[in-house]
Structure formats: structure tokens, C-alpha cells
UniProtKB/Swiss-Prot annotation:
Alpha-D-taluronate binds at E75, N97, R153, R173, Y196, N213, E214, R240. It comes from Sulfitobacter sp. (strain NAS-14.1). This is Solute-binding protein NAS141_03721. Residues 1-27 form the signal peptide. The complex is comprised of an extracytoplasmic solute-binding protein and a heteromeric permease formed by two transmembrane proteins.
Length: 330
């Protein structure tokens, strides 16, 4: 029996029960959440904040049952569960895991989408992404109630990469989505989609000269041992939607729906501040320990101009050209 089938059988009954209500005001609502991480991770802390805010704002009885450390599967499982309205009611997801339902949603992960943290926060605090939210709800029956994230991805390399001469032909690992390689090819680098668990050895043996990542992952997996030079390209700032099953959301009383949306927005703002702050702290810890040398790229504005044609073509391909322009204009 597959993990998905077994899990669905075990918990679908509980999930259905969580979304059935009596006509009395005293009826208790039970909502089950899922996190891939432990209590110390920023995403889990954000979900806990969401729960806390709902408890504070809602006069009725709501019980939360948040399962941690991947107990209910991985994110791809969560997407299926949310779509079907079984097993879980709320979680945090990477946009890429929802692409099979909503083709334009990976725009959130496109490199150089955001000019800086202020632009990123302005977009996520507005209704600019409403078309993506509508698409996801219509096609996947998954409702976005807030946005967290905040980890900033930069270049990490054996030797310093601070000029376009350094970047030209630079052999680097990128994530598997084609847009990732296309962006760095436009910047004259030589990207390849090496498996993440092979990156350390690939740098150590000279197969690649570097890669790109967030400070937390660099620190946790000690990538600084083989690539001690970090260049502040700030090419990606993480966006992670806080989501709820549409079936669950629609089953809630109207006053609880309003509270969920308010709590999701506030929890998202909390999570963004938390993760972006932790990102800076972890980076500084590695600098203070002498593990990393940090440099600014000499002309990041030119990077933004060089990648625009690639971004435009990608947005057109996934039907998100108007959305891309709206993000840029924010």
C-alpha cells in the first residue's frame, strides 16, 4: 500500500469530521495542519502564529492539530490532500509543488522577480498576486490565505564571483526548473541542474565551481567548507503561500472564514519578518566565524536588465505576462 493511500485512509475520516458542523453555535471546529519541519523552523513558527491568531480573534471553539516533521508526507502529498479535501486542512507550500494545477504559479519562484526586500514585501502585502490565487482556487481548490518566506538566495563559489568577467562561463548548479538555467545563461554563466545531494562533492571535485542558495542551507550543510565566497546577487527571495483546502474553507462559518483570512495575512507578515531576519543572522554568524567572505556583485542593476527578455518569454509561456508587469510596477 502506498504512503499516500495509507495516509489518506487513516486520516480522511478525521478530516471529513473536521469539516462537518452542527447548527449550534457551540460546535467545535477541528483543523489539521502539516509541516515538513520541527518546531524551530520558521514555517512551523508561522503556522503556530496562524493558529494563535485564529484563537485570539474567533469567539467560537477551534482546535488545531499540527503534525510536524513530515508525519503526513511531503509537500507533493499535501497538495493532493488539499485538492481532495482529505488528511490536512492547512499548511505552507512551495509554489513549484502546485504547478501541476496552476501553471502560472511558479512565477513566484522566478529569479530576479523582486528588486529587493522592500519590493518583495510590498508585493506580498498587496493584492497583486490575486490572479494567481484565483487560478489556484479554481483549478486546485486550494485557497491562499497569506504569504510567508524571506530567505534570500545568493551565489556561493570556490573563488570570488563579483564581476561579469568572473561570472562568464562560471560552472554553477541551479534548481531543476528550466527558467532557473535560462536566467543564469542570460547572465553568461554555465548552469547545470545537478542533484542537490551531489553539490558538495561536485564543488569539491571541480565538476562545478559554485551554486546558489539561502544562508540557512549553506550553514546547515556546511557548504562554506568547499565554497567560502558568497556574492550578494539577491536573485531570489522566497515566497511560500500559507494555504487551506478550499473544501475546508468553504465548510467554515462565514465569521470563521473572515478570521482565517485576517489571521493568514497577519501570520504571513510575521513569518516574512521572522525568516528574513533569521536569514541575515545566519549569514552574519558564518561571517563572524570566518567561514564566509561576503561581497557585493559590482553591477546588479545590469543583471536585472539582462534577464528581462528571459522573464518576459517565460511569463508569456505560462500565461502570466500581465501579472509580471503588475509585479514590476508595484
Amino acid at each position: 500500500m502506498s504512503f499516500f493511500t495509507k495516509t489518506a485512509q487513516l486520516v480522511s475520516g478525521a478530516a471529513v469530521a473536521a469539516t462537518l458542523f452542527t447548527a449550534t453555535a457551540q460546535a467545535e471546529t477541528v483543523l489539521r495542519g502539516a509541516s515538513m519541519f520541527d518546531e524551530e523552523h520558521a514555517f512551523t513558527k508561522t503556522l503556530r502564529k496562524f493558529e494563535e491568531l485564529v484563537d485570539e480573534k474567533y469567539d467560537g471553539d477551534v482546535t488545531f492539530d499540527l503534525r510536524l516533521n513530515g508525519e503526513l508526507g511531503v509537500e507533493s502529498d499535501y497538495v493532493t490532500f488539499l485538492n481532495q479535501g482529505v488528511a490536512i486542512d492547512y499548511t505552507i507550500l512551495a509554489p513549484s509543488n502546485m504547478a501541476k494545477f496552476a501553471p502560472s504559479i511558479p512565477l513566484m519562484d522566478m529569479p530576479f522577480l523582486f528588486r529587493d526586500l522592500d519590493h518583495w514585501n510590498a508585493v506580498l502585502s498587496s493584492d497583486v498576486l490575486a490572479p494567481l490565487e484565483d487560478e489556484l482556487l479554481e483549478k486546485a481548490d486550494i485557497k491562499i490565505v497569506g504569504y510567508t518566506g524571506g530567505g534570500t538566495r545568493n551565489l556561493l563559489s570556490k573563488q570570488p564571483v563579483v564581476t561579469f568577467d568572473d561570472l562568464k562561463g562560471h560552472k554553477m548548479r541551479v534548481m531543476g526548473a528550466p527558467i532557473q538555467a535560462q536566467i543564469f545563461q542570460a547572465l553568461t554563466a554555465a548552469p547545470s541542474a545537478i542533484a542537490y545531494n551531489e553539490v558538495y562533492n561536485a564543488i569539491q571535485t571541480g565538476v562545478i565551481a559554485g551554486f546558489e542558495n539561502e544562508a540557512a542551507s549553506i550553514q546547515n550543510l556546511k557548504f562554506y567548507e568547499v565554497a567560502p565566497n558568497l556574492t550578494l546577487t539577491r536573485h531570489s527571495i522566497t515566497v511560500r503561500p500559507i494555504v487551506m483546502s478550499g473544501k475546508t474553507f468553504n465548510s467554515l462559518p462565514a465569521d470563521l472564514q473572515a478570521v482565517v483570512l485576517e489571521a493568514g495575512e497577519e501570520a504571513g507578515a510575521y513569518g516574512r519578518e521572522l525568516e528574513s531576519r533569521e536569514d541575515g543572522v545566519k549569514l552574519q554568524e558564518m561571517v563572524d566565524a570566518g567561514q564566509l567572505t561576503v561581497s557585493e556583485f559590482e553591477n546588479r542593476d545590469k543583471m536585472l536588465e539582462m534577464v528581462k527578455p528571459v522573464q518576459d518569454a517565460y511569463a508569456a509561456e505560462i500565461g502570466a505576462s500581465d501579472l509580471l508587469e503588475a509585479v514590476r510596477a508595484k
